[in-house]
Amino acid sequence: MRHGDISSSPDTVGVAVVNYKMPRLHTKNEVLENCRNIAKVIGGVKQGLPGLDLIIFPEYSTHGIMYDRQEMFDTAASVPGEETAILAEACKKNKVWGVFSLTGEKHEQAKKNPYNTLILVNDKGEIVQKYRKILPWCPIECWYPGDKTYVVDGPKGLKVSLIICDDGNYPEIWRDCAMRGAELIVRCQGYMYPAKEQQIAIVKAMAWANQCYVAVANATGFDGVYSYFGHSSIIGFDGHTLGECGEEENGLQYAQLSVQQIRDARKYDQSQNQLFKLLHRGYSGVFASGDGDKGVAECPFEFYKTWVNDPKKAQENVEKFTRPSVGVAACPVGDLPTK
């Protein structure tokens, strides 16, 4: 893991995260023009950082937030589509990989709300991962939720997963990506005040807990509704920050992520190898007791057992100490039911 140079090497993936200014757009043509601007940014960053392998833009950076429901439907993209064609061509032209936001992606059933989607494009201009946000930021966001994570071989073979904004507040999604082999988890977000300190802290904790690299791209600026705090960052698999932006609009950070180092750590680290130890619980004591050398593999957590085997019951259980309705009468949001 290295920070401070503009290069990369056969073993290191050069990663840049962009503090892209949150756009406020209303039409398809405006979205496409913004895509062309993102393409120009890619070219400029590659010129300044010749070692760049992967560039990451925030959630909402392509479309902005469509606060008008009709505009949200009118500007929703297809994958592949006009928007992705512009972004893919920029990746191919500059020989870099890119992560881009589509807010939204058209639902398969036209009348249902769009998805909040990320795509990973390789340096040949091919879409190699499409991820739909599993945990939209309720009660405000009205995206239709996705249903799974993905892991693919990224630049130089580094294994990459994508997650979006509020997803990252749930330890389960980080662990799912890591346990499926992800070495770099990319979190694209359009996070606003007042949650700045919590969001900076959680990505470091999740990198540490899951022994993975984390790259965060966050929006900046004010779109007339929310103020976005930036602080796009790149975190090492030991939980230390390699590089972090401030609140500056269109700032960026860059670091080199070693493929060999993370694989070495996951194989040889012992006391802090959380991924291995979770599935080999108490192996020292089990071995000393003559019960084998693999520890305990079974899940000890009652909540997870219930959730997998009876999700409706798990939902009812949490409602007993939270609330039974999605809406809250004391602070209603839209037309969400409060009873």
Swiss-Prot record:
Q: Where is the CN hydrolase domain?
A: 13-259
Is Hydrolase among the key words of this record? yes
- Reactions that this protein is recorded to catalyse: a monocarboxylic acid amide + H2O = a monocarboxylate + NH4(+)
Entries under Gene3D superfamilies matching the protein? Carbon-nitrogen hydrolase
Question: Which keywords fit this entry according to its UniProt record?
Answer: Hydrolase
Provide the active-site residues from the annotation: E59 (proton acceptor), K133 (proton donor), C165 (nucleophile)
* EC number(s) stated in the UniProt entry for this protein: 3.5.1.4
Q: Which InterPro entries match?
A: Aliph_Amidase/BUP, Aliphatic_amidase, C-N_Hydrolase, C-N_Hydrolase_sf
Q: What class of enzyme is it?
A: hydrolase
Q: Recall the GO molecular function terms of this protein's record.
A: amidase activity
UniProt cross-references to PANTHER family, sorted A to Z: ALIPHATIC AMIDASE, NITRILASE C965.09-RELATED
| Family of this protein | Belongs to the carbon-nitrogen hydrolase superfamily. Aliphatic amidase family.
Function, as annotated, reads: Catalyzes the hydrolysis of short-chain aliphatic amides to their corresponding organic acids with release of ammonia. Also exhibits in vitro acyl transferase activity, transferring the acyl moiety of short-chain amides to hydroxylamine to form hydroxamates.
HAMAP family, per this entry? Aliphatic_amidase (MF_01242)
What is this protein's name? Aliphatic amidase
